[in-house]
Regions:
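Domain-terminus/edge residues, biased toward the C-terminal soluble/receptor-binding domains
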Residues: 4-159
C-alpha cells in the first residue's frame, strides 16, 4: 500500500506499508526533495526494519495462561487468557530475553462473565514494557449455592 503527496512547503511525502514473513511495517517519509528520494528513503526504512526486527506471536486467543481463585462461585477457579492474540515486534535475536508477568485482580467474586477483564499480562524486554494486554475470563462462572456463598463470605472476612 502506498500513499503519496507533495507540496512546495512540505516536499515529497510517502506512507508505505509492506508485509514479509508475517511482519507488517509502515514507513512515513516527509519532506524529501524528489520522487526518487522519497522512494529510496522509504525502501531504506523497510529494509532496515525487516533486517533488524522480527515479530513473534507470544500467546494465542483462548489459551489458558493462569487460573484465579473465584469467591462465591459455582467453581473455585476461573481460567484466564486473552481475547485476541498477543504479538511483539523486537530486535532480532532477543526473543529469549523476553519476560512476561501476570497480574490478577484480588478477590474476584462471582458471577463472572466470559471475556470479563480480571487482570493483565505485561511483556518486557529488559526494562522496557513492549506489550500489555488484559487477561479475561475464558468461561462464565455463575454464583455458587447459598451454602457456598456463606462459606466464602466467612473466609473472605478472615483474609
Amino acid at each position: 500500500m502506498c500513499i503519496r503527496d507533495s507540496t512546495d512547503s512540505a516536499g515529497y511525502c510517502l506512507v508505505t506499508s509492506a508485509e514479509k514473513e508475517g511482519m507488517r511495517l509502515i514507513t512515513v517519509v516527509l519532506g524529501t526533495k524528489s520522487v526518487n528520494a522519497r522512494a529510496e528513503a522509504s525502501q531504506a526504512l523497510l529494509n532496515y526494519g525487516f533486517r533488524f526486527f522480527e515479530t513473534h506471536k507470544l500467546y494465542d486467543t483462548g489459551t489458558a495462561l493462569t487460573n484465579a481463585r473465584i469467591w462465591k462461585g459455582s467453581t473455585e477457579n476461573v481460567q484466564l487468557g486473552l481475547d485476541r492474540p498477543l504479538y511483539a515486534t523486537i530486535p532480532r535475536g532477543q526473543y529469549k530475553s523476553l519476560e512476561a508477568s501476570m497480574t490478577v485482580d484480588n478477590q474476584i467474586i462471582a458471577p463472572v462473565s466470559a471475556g470479563q477483564s480480571l487482570g493483565s499480562v505485561l511483556v518486557r524486554l529488559g526494562d522496557e514494557v513492549i506489550a500489555e494486554q488484559e487477561l479475561v475470563a475464558l468461561q462464565a462462572i455463575g454464583e455458587g449455592s447459598f451454602w457456598q456463598r456463606i462459606v466464602d463470605e466467612a473466609m473472605l472476612y478472615f483474609e
